[in-house]
Amino acid sequence: SCYNPCLPRSSCGPTPLANSCNEPCLFRQCQDSTVVIEPSPVVVTLPGPILSSFPQNTVVGGSSTSAAVGSILSSQGVPISSGGFNLSGLSGRYSGARCLPC
């Protein structure tokens, strides 16, 4: 199916952001951990001060995952609106029967 989670690869070569059957995998980092975003509704709300300054060492709500996602998005130039942002919007176009065949 098109919703299999992406598995980390052992090599750190260049990889596409998405391919036909692994579209839910939007971010792949060759670091200690890999951030995988699956097509389920996940809302990350960031408070005002972080939206203006994006400090790299800030932890949002005690969750380092939220801070990591915010840091990755801000470092790649993805705008984050003042009302927070919805990660499901990034993968919403891959839902239902719109999965491309392998």
Swiss-Prot record:
Signal peptide: none annotated. Keywords: Acetylation, Keratin. It holds the Pfam family Keratin. It comes from the Eukaryota. The keyword Acetylation applies. One of its GO terms (molecular function) is structural constituent of cytoskeleton. The modification N-acetylserine is found at S1. One of its GO terms (cellular component) is intermediate filament. InterPro entries: Keratin. Transmembrane segments: none annotated. Belongs to the avian keratin family. The avian keratins (F-ker, S-ker, C-ker and B-ker) are a complex mixture of very similar polypeptides. This is Feather keratin. It comes from Dromaius novaehollandiae.
